[in-house]
Amino acid sequence: MELKHGYYHLIAILTVAIWGLTFISTKVLINHGLTPQEIFFYRFLIAYLGIWVISPKRLFTNNWQDELWLVAGGIFGGSLYFFTENTALGITQASNVSFIICTAPLLTTILSLLFYKSEKASKGLIYGSLLALMGVGLIVFNGSFVLKISPIGDLLTLLAALSWAFYSLIIKKMAGRYPTIFITRKIFFYGVLTILPAFLLHPLHPDTAVLLQPAVLFNLLFLAVLASLICYVLWNVVLKQLGTVRASNYIYLNPLFTMIASFLILDEKITLVALGGAACIVCGVYWAEKK
C-alpha cells in the first residue's frame, strides 16, 4: 500500500532532523583523531556493506550511460560533496560554511527549472525559500553579522552546495528507471571508490584501538547506518515523490535541528536572534510547501 502524499513531507522532516545531528557526531569523531576523509570513507563503506545485504542481486544498470549517471551521483552526493565541505571547514569560518551550504535548495530550484519543464516555482515557494534562508543566516551568525570572506574556502563550500543540487537532479533522472535501494547502493559504492584518490595526499592509517572506542564506534554507526543507509534511501524516495524543488526546501530545517541538538547535547545557549531565525525557517518552509 502506497503512503499517502502527506507522509512524504514527514519523512523529509525526519530525515533532515537526523542529518542535523551529523555535525555533532562528526565533531566527536574529529576530536578523537579521525580525519574528514576517514570519516566519510568509513561512513559510506559501512553503509554500502549494510545495503548490500538488502539489495545484493543486481550489479549493474541497463546500459553504460545510466551507470555513468550513478558514478556522477556517487561523486556529487558523496565524495565531492563531503570532501569540499570538510576541506572548506579547515579553511574558512564554520559559520560561512553552514550558511553557504544551505543555498543548496536554492541552487537545486534554479537547476530544476533550467533542466526540467515539469518543475514549477510558485511565488510562495520563492518567497518562502528566501525567508527560510534568512532564518538560516540568523541562526548561523547568531546576531554577529560579520562575514569574513575566504575566497577558496567559500568557493569550496559553494561547490559542495552545487554538488548536492546536481545530486538531487541525478536522483530524479534515475528514480523512474531503477529501485531506490539499488540506486542508493550504487551511490555508496561510487562514493567510496571516488574518495580513494584523496588518500594519496593523506594516507589512510586505520587505528583499531581508536575505532573500537565506544564513542567512536557509536558515532560511526550512527553516521553510517542511520544518517547514510536509512536516510539516503528515504531521501531518494522523497525526491522521487515530492520532486527535487519541494523536497530540497526541507534542507533549510537542517540548522534548526542542529541548534536544538546542540542545546540538548552540548549545552549550547539559544539566543533570541536564533529563536527568531528558527521562526523564519519554520514559516518559510511552510510558506514554500503550501499550495
Question: Which residues does each PLM region occupy?
Answer:
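Hydrophobic transmembrane alpha-helices of multi-pass small-molecule transport proteins
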Residues: 51, 71, 105, 111, ...
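Helix-helix packing/entry segments at the starts of transmembrane helices
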Residues: 10, 42, 82, 97-103, ...
